[in-house]
Swiss-Prot record:
Keywords: Early protein. It comes from Epstein-Barr virus (strain B95-8). Residues 134-148 have a biased composition (Polar residues). This is Uncharacterized protein BLLF2. Residues 1-86, 122-148 are annotated as: Disordered. Residues 38-57 have a biased composition (Basic residues). Pfam families: DUF5451. Disulfide bonds: none annotated. It comes from the Viruses.
Length: 148
């Protein structure tokens, strides 16, 4: 008797099967090529734009700076026999949270005192100040509405 006829062809050993599966195109079947690690430049996907580094990384309001006390040196009050000692700086670094509760100095303009540092940035957006009321100086019968 003859051996039984096999319906399916025998599978290739695993090493050769893997080589056959990595053939990229049927026309390249002559030499077994694995797919390239990097496709050529035209087929690569474009890289997303890199986040730009900021030229000014933090605004001045976000930077915490130590507040130094004013140096008090009054040479008039000293006696002639006394030697002037260098001023002792006992600075306590106040963080930004403590500074927010302090009142601004009196000599600052009202806009800066009311709005803080952001008031200088918003100053150009504020409405123009109204002209002083002139209805008392020249009452005219043709103007019914006063400018103020």
């Amino acid at each position: 008797m003859c051996p039984p006829v096999r319906q399916h062809p025998a599978q290739a050993p695993p090493a050769k099967r893997q080589a056959l599966e990595t053939v990229p195109h049927p026309q390249n079947r002559g030499r077994l090529m694995s797919p390239k690690a990097r496709p050529p430049k035209m087929q690569r996907r474009p890289r997303p734009p890199v986040a730009k580094r900021r030229r000014f990384p933090r605004s001045p309001q976000q930077v915490e700076r130590p507040i130094l006390p004013p140096v008090e040196s009054t040479p008039q009050d000293m006696e002639p026999g006394q030697v002037q000692s260098p001023p002792q700086i006992t600075a306590v670094i106040q963080l930004r949270q403590d500074r927010d509760t302090m009142r601004p100095p009196i000599y600052l303009p009202a806009l800066l005192a009311n709005c803080g540092p952001a008031g200088l940035l918003r100053a150009h957006r504020l409405p123009q100040p109204k002209p002083p009321c002139q209805s008392r100086q020249r009452p005219s019968p043709d103007s019914q509405t006063s400018p103020c």
